[in-house]
Structures are given as structure tokens and as C-alpha cells.
Amino acid sequence: IFDFGVPLPMLDIAEVSGQLPIDVVPIYRIEPLIADLLKQDLTWAEFKDAYDTSISEGLSSGLYKGVKSIIAYRTGLDVSPLSRTPDQGYQALDAIKRGLGGGSMKKLRDHLLCRAIELCMEYDVPMQIHTGMGDVEVNLVMCRPAYLLDLLRFPTYRACRVLLVHTGYPYHREAAYMANVLPRTYLDISEGIPFASSAAWDII
């Protein structure tokens, strides 16, 4: 499963596939979809239908083999498992369209992440969630993997396979603990380790 980046990939699938002795398939990022839908004057019913349809079609077609979110770098990982209440998405989008604050963008993103996890379970694909380090403008404290504990062990979502990207570094102890106690939670060790001290290997 390959992340080709946003907004445009530097490499296409054919070019990457030609360099690797394995099948290469892209992952579906939800944040570009959310940004695109927010630019349109949609009712909540239209918004959620378009969101579901876009992800579902990508997964059911086999074009994408997983879903990815960088919600950590937008509104943080403190996502309540109760964010999928019937009214939260509607109320959040309405507040955003009327230019109101009150954490409406966070409420919308939390709601949509929970829905993405549900779709991952429906199509039996993994969910990748960025954790830990990111760009200079991120609030690192809100990127702590432990904020996801309540969500990932909630009965509705615990069956989803979840990959914690970047090992949660510098909170890799938290991420390692979660991968140990949550049977369907895993660590990505590809990018975090080059930026970490050699001791990080021993901790993980």
C-alpha cells in the first residue's frame, strides 16, 4: 500500500511498480476529499452521501486498498468514539457554513474519521492514522497516539485494523503500548526511526 502524496504524486503507480518486485496499490486519503466537499455548497445529506460514495467506490473497485487520515495535524487525535452521533455531522457542517466557531471543524472531522473507520471494516481494509511528528505548524501534543485509545477499543471500532504512522514519535512508548494491548493496532516504523535516536529501536 503506497501513499503517493497530496495534492499530486511525484511518481505514478506504473513508475513505482516498475521499481519494486511487489504489487503497488494507492491508499485513499480522506482530508483532500473533505476539503473538496467543503468548497461545495452541500446540505449535510449531500455531503455525507458524497463522502461515503467516494470512499466506497474507491475501495469496492479495488483501486485503493486502505484509507489514511492526517487528522492529527488538523484538529488532533482526541477523537471521541461518540462522535458518530446522528446530529454531530449535521450541526458541525451547519456551524461551519454559517461561519461559527466553537470547534465545529473538529467535530466534523472527528465524525468523518469515525465513519471512515466504519467503511474500512466494511471493506476489510486497514486504516492508517498519522501520529506524532509532522510539519512545523502542527500541535505536537495533540498528535499523541494515546488520545486514540478510547476510540480504538470502543466496541464499534475495535475490529478495524489500524496502523499508527511514524510510530507516534516522539511518543513511541505510547504507540508501542497500544500495539501491544490492542490486537488489531500496528506500528509503522518506516519514517519515524530515521529521525529518532538509536534508543527508539529498543523501546519499540
Kindly give the residue locations of the regions a language model identified.
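Metal-cofactor-binding active-site regions of metalloenzymes
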Residues: 1-109, 113-118, 181-184, 194-195, ...
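Catalytic pocket-lining loop regions of alpha/beta-barrel enzymes
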Residues: 76, 89-204
